[in-house]
Amino acid sequence: MGIQFETDYNMETLTAMAKGLRKTVRKKRSRRVHIFAAVVLILGLLTILATTAGGEPPGASGVVTLLALLVLILATVFEDRLNAWFARKRLLPGTEHAAATFEEDGYVSATGVTESRFSYAQIVAVAETARYFVFALSSHHTQAYDKRTIRGGSVEDFRAFIAEKTGKLVENIQ
């Protein structure tokens, strides 16, 4: 009997998972996307300023540009929640709750529909938020474990255990 977790995959959990991916395995891509968004934002603002410099109100194209910039800002600010929303839409029925048990040779995650066994070698990165441990299995797949439900050990014990088993540093993300 190893360390156990029970996790509900709700919007908060899915948002933490999206953030975990963005801050670990997608870090470089995320940085590029944010730089691209900033450049587009600056160019859009310069375009609006150039068209309104003569004292004329912005036309239809200026309003459309402004709305596009607003959508860009909102998508960038709320990207983790947006990704969580899409993930929730793709969540299979019966997988909203998972129970996981961590042993020496691997771990088992059970949902209402299936039970899956994983080896620690499958974990690409480990992140920790205030409430969750997030495992990145690829650039598109994660698992989250709610620290409030831990049994069979402490959070500190699990942090040391998973770092040893994966050979990966547990990244603290806020």
Segments and roles (model prediction):
Residues 1-50:
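N-terminal membrane-targeting/pre-transmembrane regions
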Residues 17, 111, 136-138:
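Residue-level recognition of conserved beta-strand positions in structured domain cores
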Residues 55-70:
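Hydrophobic alpha-helical transmembrane segments
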Residues 75-117:
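Conserved beta-hairpin
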Residues 101-102, 128, 137:
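Generic beta-strand structural signal
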Residues 107, 116-133:
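Phosphoinositide-dependent membrane-docking surfaces
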Residues 115-117, 124-126, 140-143, 151:
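Short, surface-exposed beta-strand-loop junctions and turns on beta-sheet-rich folds
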Residues 132-174:
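A membrane-cytosol interface segment of integral membrane proteins
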